[in-house]
Amino acid sequence: MTETAKLADVILPGRSYAEKEGTFSNTERRVQRVRKAVEIEGDTKPDTWIFTEIMRRMGYPQPHLTPAQIMDEIASVTPSFAGISHERLDSEEVNGQGLQWPCTSKDHPGTPIMHVGKFARGLGYFRPAAYTPSMELPDEEYPL
């Protein structure tokens, strides 16, 4: 158990990145498949299982969906992801390269460059965050 976990009131049985199945989006808006690389012994659970189990215990039951079903739901409610699915990400057409959103239909090639020449709404906005001091600092009881 890690030093942080020793201080926790609740420990969730999450998996490491190498144990996960699903998708991720990087900073260039590229959605790519993630495939489980290792099988770890123990009682770990997918993040989606943890979320739905917490909801169930709070009185809001939800079905346990597969990563592909979750991606399909995201595509059905988010127009810029409408053309992205596990099936398409796994296809020879995509060839392991992923798709860049917006990808608005099943035959859309994705959008490698989002803004050409200028931003759609004019200049970009820069808003530096104001410094906020920590509400709690490490102490003897919680040294991390």
Regions found by a protein language model. Give the residues of each.
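Non-catalytic alpha/beta scaffold blocks inside enzyme catalytic domains
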Residues: M1-S85
